[in-house]
Amino acid sequence: MQLILLEKVANLGNLGDKVNVKAGYGRNYLLPYGKATAATAANLAAFEERRAELEKAAADKKASAETRAAQLAELEVTITATAGDEGKLFGSIGTHDIADALTASGVEVQKSEVRLPNGTIRNVGEFDVAVHLHAEVEATVRVVVVAA
């Protein structure tokens, strides 16, 4: 399936690239989320007319993500959770908990933007958590988990 990308997509291409993807990826992700359009002659012409507008929108999104990244870089979030004597949590701290704590501290973060490559946090301590704000912008936040 040939598509024209309407924004930068990680591991696929940039705005305006004509790419070949599997039909399921195109139909179920790229097209419904407005990240691409079918590569027909009419859509190519319409895209070229809107290219400047789309590039400006992409630049605005990146600029707002960089602003949020600068705010997040200064943050250190403390999350209180019940834990046993040896520092092992009863339960865990996941992306939803971290996103809620960051939002409460003044920076709007969605849980899908929080990246925990090693899985949920299950111990008391300090952790560096990556927050993926844009395809090109990522911030690191210090999360401190303390026992209640």
From Swiss-Prot:
Report the Gene3D superfamilies cross-referenced here: Ribosomal protein L9, C-terminal domain (3.10.430.100), Ribosomal protein L9, N-terminal domain (3.40.5.10)
Functional summary from the UniProt entry: Binds to the 23S rRNA.
Q: Which GO terms describe its cellular component?
A: ribonucleoprotein complex; ribosome
Q: Is Transmembrane among this UniProt entry's keywords? A: no
Which HAMAP family does the record associate with it? Ribosomal_bL9
Name of the featured protein: Large ribosomal subunit protein bL9
Task: Kindly list the biological process annotations in GO that this record carries.
Answer: translation
Q: Does the keyword Protease apply?
A: no
Say which family it is in.
Belongs to the bacterial ribosomal protein bL9 family.
What does the UniProt keyword field contain? Ribonucleoprotein, Ribosomal protein, RNA-binding, rRNA-binding
What GO molecular functions are on record for this protein? rRNA binding; structural constituent of ribosome
Q: Which Pfam families does UniProt cross-reference here?
A: Ribosomal_L9_C, Ribosomal_L9_N
List the NCBIfam families: L9
